[in-house]
Amino acid sequence: MSNNNNSPTTVNQETTTSREVSITLPTDQSPQTSPGSSSSPSPRPSGGSPARRTATGLSGKHSIFRGIRLRNGKWVSEIREPRKTTRIWLGTYPVPEMAAAAYDVAALALKGPDAVLNFPGLALTYVAPVSNSAADIRAAASRAAEMKQPDQGGDEKVLEPVQPGKEEELEEVSCNSCSLEFMDEEAMLNMPTLLTEMAEGMLMSPPRMMIHPTMEDDSPENHEGDNLWSYK
């Protein structure tokens, strides 16, 4: 009988121990899974790719515009010469849009119309450099950057190329056309004395004025002529 009473007690102790183990096992494994959770204070670096998606990456390059980079708080624009390792410095600008426009002018000059531009819609408004020298390209790039210069209100300036002297030529032509519309013929032909001069040149007296019958003169001279012819 004593053996039968001891056996159930042993089984209960074993089951109790197994329950305790089953309860304590999850708590032992929980610290191992915590480093992989989202609340970890030190995640693994992703190789720099998230930094590339920002406005400026680790190297200072812009994520949208080509040929510019951030350096000391300003945007530097530069372009590599074709088939060379040298670069042409195009200037330093306060906003990225100005530096991007400067790059576009240089890209068109060095790579032609097939160049990839930051502002393709403004390609026809850019003034091409005089030559492909670094100085001429830099000067043309500076003019293009001024077109993207923001004013005090934050809006960009839109500058249209104006040909020097064009307005003066238009005004001069309009004034000449106005002067030709009015011509003083009497002053040019001297109309008051024209007929008299013609008569003197032909040795003829000017024609007499016709007198209306009702305005005939009743002077004796006129009646004398009538009286002479009235006698037979």
UniProtKB/Swiss-Prot annotation:
**Biased amino acid composition, Low complexity:** 30-50
CDD domains named in the record: AP2
Coarse class of the primary localization is nucleus
* A GO biological-process term: ethylene-activated signaling pathway
**Portion annotated as DNA-binding:** 64-120
Physiological role = Probably acts as a transcriptional activator. Binds to the GCC-box pathogenesis-related promoter element. May be involved in the regulation of gene expression by stress factors and by components of stress signal transduction pathways.
* Record protein name field: Ethylene-responsive transcription factor ERF025
Gene name in the database record: ERF025
